[in-house]
Amino acid sequence: MYGIEYTTILISLTSITLLNYILKSITRMMDYIIYRFLLIAVILATMINAQNYGVNLPITGSMDTAYANSTQNEPFWTSTLCLYYPVEASNEMADTEWKDTLSQLFLTKGWPTGSVYFKEYTDIAAFSVEPQLYCDYNLVLMKYDSTQELDMSELADLILNEWLCNPMDITLYYYQQTDEANKWISMGSSCTVQVCPLNTQTLGIGCLITNPDTFETVATPEKLVITDVVDGVNHKLNVTTATCTIRNCEKLGPRENVAVIQVGGANILDITADPTTTPQTERMMRINWKKWWQVFYTVVDYVNQIIQTMSKRSRSLNSSAFYYRV
């Protein structure tokens, strides 16, 4: 009887000892595998350059900062630059080779030949109807004219911002603007815009909805009109739809691949609609020269500093899409 008990105890001790030995062996083996794997990983990491797949976000600045002219060290091999100028510039310079000359000068600033495009427009009114901004970076030169100051301000507001627009059926519906970013943009060869505000009973306030002659005229006749009315109030509209298209638009934010360079004038135009805010000057700058050769020389000299205030975008601005984001 006692022999059986001793045998059982001996077997138990032997099993415990054997199990302990097996566990220690497994532990040493796992440590060996882990340490060896880590050693190999460290060695490979020092020999292989890992690729970082992060996004390189552009940094934009403000033109309130004074910029010095300099040559950009890194060429813009993969970027395109569009320079928009009025026809009077080419007429004044009267040089058939002026574009080639400027292309060679842009080359000294890191812009390869063929990456800079020169786009001519007739005047501010004509450019307002068909502003096509297709390049990675777009610089628009606008000659200051006191008689066209408001047209210049509206055009700058249009091209310096992104707008999400929807069609308006003014024959069937009343419309209201919901907030300050909500505007009605009219564009065409001749736009006359009249509005009649309505009360809660849809009766005209100071006007008759059945008689457009009693409507208030907010624009006549213009090629580009950005209409701002009292928010939260329904309006009946009358627009010369035969020569003009009107859309209900929401300002989404700045279009950072566009900059406007005002040529002449005492001050930079204020393109803000809100009279209580500080005038917007970012990507809106001024060159104070009389001759167009001097204007273009200055643009070439400072082009890379101007580009630093902008961000490269893949979207284009095309009036046929009426400023939809694409």
Curated annotation (Swiss-Prot):
Which residues take part in binding Ca(2+) 2?
177, 228-229, 231, 301
Q: Which Gene3D superfamilies match?
A: Glycoprotein VP7, domain 1 (3.40.50.11130), Rotavirus outer-layer protein VP7, domain 2 (2.60.120.800)
Residues annotated as region CNP motif? 165-167
According to the record, which residues are glycosylated? 69, 238, 318
PTM comment text? N-glycosylated. The N-terminus is blocked possibly by pyroglutamic acid.
Question: Which GO terms fall under molecular function for this chain's record?
Answer: metal ion binding
Q: Where is this region: GPR motif?
A: 253-255
Q: Which HAMAP family match?
A: Rota_VP7 (MF_04130), Rota_VP7_A (MF_04131)
Similarity field:
Belongs to the rotavirus VP7 family.
What further note is attached to this protein's record?
Answer: Some rotavirus strains are neuraminidase-sensitive and require sialic acid to attach to the cell surface. Some rotavirus strains are integrin-dependent. Some rotavirus strains depend on ganglioside for their entry into the host cell. Hsp70 also seems to be involved in the entry of some strains.
Q: What is this protein called?
A: Outer capsid glycoprotein VP7
What is the taxonomic lineage of the source species? Answer: Viruses, Riboviria, Orthornavirae, Duplornaviricota, Resentoviricetes
